[in-house]
Every structure is written in structure tokens, then in C-alpha cells.
Amino acid sequence: MPGFTCCVPGCYNNSHRDKALHFYTFPKDAELRRLWLKNVSRAGVSGCFSTFQPTTGHRLCSVHFQGGRKTYTVRVPTIFPLRGVNERKVARRPAGAAAARRRQQQQQQQQQQQQQQQQQQQQQQQQQQQQQSSPSASTAQTAQLQPNLVSASAAVLLTLQATVDSSQAPGSVQPAPITPTGEDVKPIDLTVQVEFAAAEGAAAAAAASELQAATAGLEAAECPMGPQLVVVGEEGFPDTGSDHSYSLSSGTTEEELLRKLNEQRDILALMEVKMKEMKGSIRHLRLTEAKLREELREKDRLLAMAVIRKKHGM
């Protein structure tokens, strides 16, 4: 039986069965052991202690020995009657070590919080510097674009004047219309004539290119954050081409989502059916294996009987 039994002759109190009792171990000192042995109660004792030499492995129950050193109390039923397992003493840590550990944890937490605050402050400073640098860059771009705009506007005026002069040639003079107020208004033909000279054509092309560059610069200055993507059409995002059942594009509707969920459920149901079929086939194979083993055993028995008959000449 697991546990400890009292060493008093005729006493069978067990530490595993009698949980209400306490059990005491004899001390190491020989004088104390002799004193304990003298103080053992003789009530119900069927033998004598004249030749008994107690050791530290002997236990006394609280029925025959009052006091002493309490060594073992059964709290939970156990199957380990070993002294090292049942009487393992819990190593008590000093209170100072626990307090030092708590202080160390608090210091580590404070250091982590300080590091996080410093990182946040650095990020805020970087954002402020970026915000301050962006307006200055935009003003510098506009200052650089102003002379280009002036030169482009002058070139445009020159080309318009040249077209007006060419349209007022001797063969193409048209009467000026008269407004209801009586003022003469001269029409300006802005269409490009084929009879332009080579120099005028080159000047017009240069002016047009400068005008395009100036307008592009103005658009870039008005948008300091850089060129923006303008999406034209019904679909807000391009098709990435991912068409497997787990991909959800941004334009997924409720019907498509339900359809995909139903597909997944169908797949799971099919997998469950396949698993049931596999379990049935495994069970059938096991039954077949048992039958074959039984047949083999029967054949071995018959063969053994035949060999025995041959040996005995039956």
C-alpha cells in the first residue's frame, strides 16, 4: 500500500489511508531519538521496544506520539510512495529577491515607454520639417517659372501679330464690319497660313513648345505633392489578374462573396464525404486483414497437425 505505516508494533495506521493523522519522522540526533522512543504511547502496543533501534526512515503516527516534527500530511491521493517525491520541500525564495525582480521589471517598462516617447517625438519633428520644406520648394518653383511664362507670353503675342500682318496682304483685304454702336471692329484671323516664311514657322513652333512647358510647370507648381493618378472609368482599381477562390479584389460584391463562400462550403462537404469513404475503406481493410490472419492461423494449425501425424505415422 502506498504511503507510510507507523513503526509502533501492532499499529497499522497508514499515511495514504488515514489522512486525518499526522506522521512524524525520527530525528537524526541519537539522544533525541531515544527521548522520542521513551515518549511513545504504549496504548494498544502488542510488542516492546527493548530491541528496537529507530532510524530517520521510521515514522510515528499522531495516535502514539503527540508532538514532534510534522513531516508528512496527505492532501491528495498519490501513487508515489517515494520519500523524495512526497516529501519534496518547496524552496522558499527570499522576499528581497521578489521585490528586486519587481523593481527590475518596472524599470524595464519605464525604459521602454521612454524609448517609445522619444521615437514619437522624432517622427513628429521629421513631419514638421517636411511640412516646412514643402511650401519653400513650391515658391522656388513658381519663382523659376515666372520668367518662362513671360517669355512664352511674349512669343505668343509675336506670332499673333505676324498672323495679323499676313492676313492683311493686298489680295486678302476684307471690309471691316460695323457694330451697332458705330465702332469699326477689325477681324483677326487666327488660322495658320501655309504661306508663312520659314523663320515665322520656326518661331511659332518654339513659342508653342515654350507655352506647353510653361503650362506643365504651372500644373506641377499647383500640385506640390507631385503628379496624381486620375482614374477615368467605372472601375476604380485595375484588374490584377488574381482569379483564385481566396482572392478578394476591392470591387467584390456581396453576391460574389456569397458565391465564393458557397464554393468553399461545397469543397468542405466534399472533403468530409471523402474522409468518411476513406474511413469505411480502412475499416473494411482491417476486417479483411483480421479474416486473413484467422485463415493463416487455421492453415498453420492444420499444417502442424499434419506434420505431427506424419512423425507418428498415423
Swiss-Prot record:
Chain intervals annotated as zinc finger (THAP-type): 1-80
Q: Which residues form a coiled coil?
A: 255-305
Give positions of region: Disordered: 85-111
The answer to whether the entry has keyword Mitochondrion is no
Alphabetically sorted, this entry's keywords are: Activator, Coiled coil, Cytoplasm, Disease variant, DNA-binding, Epilepsy, Intellectual disability, Metal-binding, Neurodegeneration, Nucleus, Repressor, Spinocerebellar ataxia, Transcription, Transcription regulation, Zinc, Zinc-finger
Q: Which GO MF terms are attached to this record?
A: DNA binding; DNA-binding transcription activator activity, RNA polymerase II-specific; DNA-binding transcription factor activity, RNA polymerase II-specific; DNA-binding transcription repressor activity, RNA polymerase II-specific; RNA polymerase II cis-regulatory region sequence-specific DNA binding; zinc ion binding
Gene Ontology biological process terms in this record: cell population proliferation; electron transport chain; negative regulation of neuron apoptotic process; negative regulation of transcription by RNA polymerase II; neuron differentiation; regulation of mitochondrial transcription; regulation of transcription by RNA polymerase II
Q: Which disease is it linked to?
A: Methylmalonic aciduria and homocystinuria type cblL: An autosomal recessive disorder of cobalamin metabolism clinically characterized by early-onset seizures, and profound global developmental delay with severe intellectual disability. Metabolic features are mild methylmalonic aciduria, low-normal plasma methionine, and high-normal plasma homocysteine.
The name on file for this protein is THAP domain-containing protein 11
- From which source organism is this entry? Homo sapiens
What gene name is given for the protein in this entry? THAP11
